[in-house]
A protein has these predicted regions:
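Carbohydrate transferase catalytic cores enriched for Leloir-type hexosyltransferases
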Residues: 1-250
């Protein structure tokens, strides 16, 4: 990481001056050059207490460098556009929107061998969710809904740190919730294609790509009525209160 910072703060500005080039940063890069535009995908660390102190400080520095140096800032939803303007004091007319895409799913061939790893999961009979188990993804909602619906099956793929659910004593596999851990793009495609409903209970998102991938593969989706999700998915989705555990999934 030290090499990355040295490149961004010293090598890159010198190169841009020497070649009269213009820099487009797509990953919230720290900047010390005005010959640039950059993308802030979201500013969650500034609005949610879900990250460690040093990471939050480092992210603040990244955002301030964007505010001071970038000629223009892009983000991935109007929700984030207004949030960035509010929290960082960047004028709205300096912030553009460029949405994420789904076309990468065209090149993915579903790998149905994933079902061999979960013999208790039947095609077309499970609810599926994908993402890291970070707190803002709110996968606690799925665990609580699963407890209230013991006759339904849930699959949650992604990082497998179950402590993200809160109390370690509560973070245990249950008879109707399956955690395959990390899945490949091909395995994910198979799980999306055959799910009864794709669930996305996140309470904060800059965009939320997994529901878009699920739609691209023909899966029905149900999303939290929070953050940018209603803006982006409109009437293509069902919505639920991410703090209501008695929701009707049928």
């Amino acid at each position: 990481k030290a090499v990355k910072y040295f490149y961004n703060l010293a090598v890159l500005p010198a190169y841009l001056r020497r070649t009269h080039a213009f820099y487009v940063g797509l990953a919230s890069d720290m900047l010390l050059t005005k010959r640039s535009v950059t993308v802030l995908h979201d500013i969650r660390p500034l609005v949610m207490d879900t990250d460690k102190g040093f990471f939050r400080f480092k992210f603040w520095v990244h955002c301030l460098s964007t505010k001071w140096f970038a000629q223009r800032v892009f983000t991935v939803s109007d929700n984030q556009r207004h949030l960035i303007s509010e929290k960082l004091g960047i004028p709205l007319n300096k912030i553009g929107i460029t949405y994420n895409g789904w076309e990468h799913m065209k090149g993915v061939t579903p790998d149905e061998s994933i079902f061999e790893k979960m013999p208790g999961v039947q095609k077309g009979e499970y609810y599926y969710a994908l993402g890291s188990l970070a707190k803002h993804k709110n996968f606690k909602w799925i665990r609580e809904v699963a407890r209230r619906n013991p006759d339904k099956t849930f699959v949650v793929a992604g990082g497998k740190d179950l402590r993200a659910f809160g109390d370690d004593n509560e973070a245990k596999d249950t008879h109707n919730v399956f955690y395959p851990g990390y899945v490949s793009d091909a395995e994910n495609a198979a799980l999306m294609q055959h799910c009864k409903l794709f669930l996305h209970p996140a309470v904060f998102e800059g965009f939320g790509i997994p529901p878009l991938e699920a739609l691209a593969l023909g899966a029905p989706i149900a999303l939290a009525n929070a953050t940018c999700l209603p803006e982006l998915y409109g009437d293509t989705a069902r919505y639920f209160d991410p703090y209501d555990y008695d929701v009707d999934l049928d």
